[in-house]
Amino acid sequence: MTKNKFVLLRYLCLFCTNIDQIDFNSVLK
């Protein structure tokens, strides 16, 4: 994913549950 898309998803994650945040952490890895 592009950095811009990642940023958008990151902001959306703020509105999601902690489980969703774990998924984003997996993407970082």
Swiss-Prot record:
Keyword Plastid tagged: yes
Subcellular location: Plastid, Chloroplast
Gene Ontology cellular-component annotations: chloroplast
Keywords: Chloroplast, Plastid
First-listed, main subcellular location of the protein, grouped into a coarse class: plastid
Top-rank lineage group of the source organism: Eukaryota
Protein's name in the database: Uncharacterized 3.5 kDa protein in ycf33-trnY intergenic region
